C-alpha cells in the first residue's frame, strides 16, 4: 500500500491524490492493527492449549500415580476453562464490533439488566469473600431506560463487574467491596452505570491502555483475558455512551477504581 507520488501531479488533481494517500495510510494502519490483534489472540490461545497438551502427555505416562493423574486432569480442566473464556471474549468483541447500525434495539431498563447480571455474579463474589452490592435508583424509576440491545448491555455490565472481581481481594484487614451503582437525571436525560471497587486501582499512566485488547495492568496476577474492557468500550460506542475511569478512593493506599458509563436516557 505505497502512497501515490504527489510531487509530479497536476495542481488540479493534487487534492484527490492527497485524499487517496490519506485513505491508504489509514488502511495500512488498520491492517497493521488487525495483524497485531491476531498475533496477540494466537498467543493468548497458545498458552492454555500448550498446557493442555503437556498435562495430557503427563497423564498418559504408564508410571503415573492416581494422585498425579488427578492433578493433571485438574490442570487440564483449568486450561480448557481459560481457553474457552478467551474464545468467548473474542466472540463477544466480534459481536460488539459488528453491531453498527444493524444493532437490534429496544427500550432497556438498565436497573433491571443490572440486577440480572448481579445475581449471576454473586456466587463468584461469595467464593472470593467480596461484598458485592447495589446502590441507586430502583427498577421502573423514571429516566433509567435507554435505547439499546439488552444482550450487549448485559455483556458490558458483566465485563465491568468481572473486572472488579478480578482485581479486588479480600482479607481480615481489608475486606473486598465491589459496588454497582445506577444514577439517573431524568430532566437531563442522562443515566450512569458505575462499578466501583476498593482494589489497587489503575495508575494514571495506564488508564487509557487498559481499553486496548490483551493489555494487562502491570504488577498484577489477576485472572482474565485482557479483552473485557475493550468489549465494554466497543459496546458503549455502539450505544453512543461514554466510558470514564477514575480512582474510587483517591489518596488511599488502595485507591480502587470507578468505571462509569454515561448513557442518554429515553424521554
Predicted regions: what is each one?
Residues 202-214:
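Short conserved segment of the HATPase_c
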Residues 164-165:
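Short helix-loop "hinge" at the ATP-lid/N-box region of the Bergerat-fold HATPase_c
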Residues 124-139:
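Short conserved segments within the C-terminal catalytic ATPase subdomain
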Residues 240-251:
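Glycine-rich ATP-binding loops of the HATPase_c
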Residues 1-41, 45, 50-67, 95, ...:
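Membrane-proximal HAMP signal-relay module
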Residues 78-83:
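Short alpha-helical segment of the dimerization/phosphotransfer core of two-component systems
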Residues 68, 98-103, 143-148:
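Conserved micro-motifs of the catalytic ATP-binding
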Residues 10, 14, 104-119:
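A conserved beta-strand-to-alpha-helix junction within the catalytic ATP-binding
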